[in-house]
C-alpha cells in the first residue's frame, strides 16, 4: 500500500505504511491477538475498550478457529456494545455513515446509499442492516473472510467514486481521534450528499474542522494534485505529479473527468 504524499497532514500515515491485518490458515496466538485488537479498533471507531466490554465468547471462538474474521467483525457490530456506542445515541443517517466507515472502510458515495440502508433498517431491522455491509460483494472483494476491515476511503481504486475521497475525511479526523470524541450525533454528509457537493479537505489536526461546513462555498478555489494511475501490466516508473486549481462549482466535474482519464487523486485542499 503506497503512502500518500499528504498522508501525515491528513492523519492516515499509520494506515498507508501498514500491512493488512489477516488471519492466515496457519496462525500463532500472537497473530490471533493482533486480529482481535485490530478488529476492535476498526469496528469501534478507535474507541477505548474496557476489559469488561470485551466479547470473550466471540474471541474464544476465533481463537479456536470456529469462526472467521468476518464472523468476529459481525459479532462486534451486532453486539449490544456497538449499539450503545453508535446506534442509540446517533441519528439514523449518522449511524449509517459510521457503519460505512467501520465495516467498509469508506464514506457513503451518494444519497442513494443512505436511502438503501434506511430502507433495510426500517423494513428488516438492526441485524439485517449490519449484515447488508458484511455480506456485500464489496466486503467480500476487499476483505473476504480473513482480513480485518481497514480504511480505504483515502485511496483511489478501481470502482471507487472520486467524491468518496474528500467525504471520507469528513468522517475520519486522524489516527488518534475517536468517532464519539467528535461529538456528532447528526449525519455529517447530509448536505453534501443531498446537493451532490464535495467538501474541502483540511489536515487532521486543523481545529477549525470538526464536521461539515454548510455555508456558501461558491467563492472558494481548490488545489488538486494528481498522478497517472499505474497500469497493472506497465513497468514501474516514477510518475510526475500534476497540480490544478479549480473553482468550487467545477470541482465535481473535474474529479469525474480525472477519474475517466485514469488519474489518481493525491490530495484536495483549499487553494
Swiss-Prot record:
**Record-linked Pfam families:** CpcD, PBS_linker_poly
Q: Gene3D superfamilies, per this entry?
A: Phycobilisome linker domain
All disulfide bonds of the chain are none
Topological category with respect to the lipid bilayer? Peripheral membrane protein
Q: Does the keyword Thylakoid apply?
A: yes
Gene Ontology cellular-component terms listed: phycobilisome; plasma membrane-derived thylakoid membrane
SMART domains from the entry? Answer: CpcD (SM01094)
> In what residue span(s) does the CpcD-like domain sit?
219-271
Describe the location of the PBS-linker domain by residue ranges.
Answer: 1-180
Its subcellular locations are: Cellular thylakoid membrane
**InterPro entries tied to this protein:** CpcD-like_dom, PBS_linker_dom, PBS_linker_sf, Phycobilisome
Instruction: Keywords in alphabetical order, please.
Output: Antenna complex, Membrane, Photosynthesis, Phycobilisome, Thylakoid
- The lineage's top-level taxon is Bacteria
Q: Does the keyword Cell wall biogenesis/degradation apply?
A: no
The processes (GO biological process) annotated in the record are: photosynthesis
Q: Describe its function.
A: Rod linker protein, associated with phycocyanin. Linker polypeptides determine the state of aggregation and the location of the disk-shaped phycobiliprotein units within the phycobilisome and modulate their spectroscopic properties in order to mediate a directed and optimal energy transfer.
Q: Describe the family membership recorded for this protein in Swiss-Prot or TrEMBL.
A: Belongs to the phycobilisome linker protein family.
- PANTHER family of this UniProt entry? PHYCOBILIPROTEIN APCE, PHYCOBILISOME 32.1 KDA LINKER POLYPEPTIDE, PHYCOCYANIN-ASSOCIATED, ROD 2-RELATED
Q: What is this protein called?
A: Phycobilisome 30.8 kDa linker polypeptide, phycocyanin-associated, rod
Amino acid at each position: 500500500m503506497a503512502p500518500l504524499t499528504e498522508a501525515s497532514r491528513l492523519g492516515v500515515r499509520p494506515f498507508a505504511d501498514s500491512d493488512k491485518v489477516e488471519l492466515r490458515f496457519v496462525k500463532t496466538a500472537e497473530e490471533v491477538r493482533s486480529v482481535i485488537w485490530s478488529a476492535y479498533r476498526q469496528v469501534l471507531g478507535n474507541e477505548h475498550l474496557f476489559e469488561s466490554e470485551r466479547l470473550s465468547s466471540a474471541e474464544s471462538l476465533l481463537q479456536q478457529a470456529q469462526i472467521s474474521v468476518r464472523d468476529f467483525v459481525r459479532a462486534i457490530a451486532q453486539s449490544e456494545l456497538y449499539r450503545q456506542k453508535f446506534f442509540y445515541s446517533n441519528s439514523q443517517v449518522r449511524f449509517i455513515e459510521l457503519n460505512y466507515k467501520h465495516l467498509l472502510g469508506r464514506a457513503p458515495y451518494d444519497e442513494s446509499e443512505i436511502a438503501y440502508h434506511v430502507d433495510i433498517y426500517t423494513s428488516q431491522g438492526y441485524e439485517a442492516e449490519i449484515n447488508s455491509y458484511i455480506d456485500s460483494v464489496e466486503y467480500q472483494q476487499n476483505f473476504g473472510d480473513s482480513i480485518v476491515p481497514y480504511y480505504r476511503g483515502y485511496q483511489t481504486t478501481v470502482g471507487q467514486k472520486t467524491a468518496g475521497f474528500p467525504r471520507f475525511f469528513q468522517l475520519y479526523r486522524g489516527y488518534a481521534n475517536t468517532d464519539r470524541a467528535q461529538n456528532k450525533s447528526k449525519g455529517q454528509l447530509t448536505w453534501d450528499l443531498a446537493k451532490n457537493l464535495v467538501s474541502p479537505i483540511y489536515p487532521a489536526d486543523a481545529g477549525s474542522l470538526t464536521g461539515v461546513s454548510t455555508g456558501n462555498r461558491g467563492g472558494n478555489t481548490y488545489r488538486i494534485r494528481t498522478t497517472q494511475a499505474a497500469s497493472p501490466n506497465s513497468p514501474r516508473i516514477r510518475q510526475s505529479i500534476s497540480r490544478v486549481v479549480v473553482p468550487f462549482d467545477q470541482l465535481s466535474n473535474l474529479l469525474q473527468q480525472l477519474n475517466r482519464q485514469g488519474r489518481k487523486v493525491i490530495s484536495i485542499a483549499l487553494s
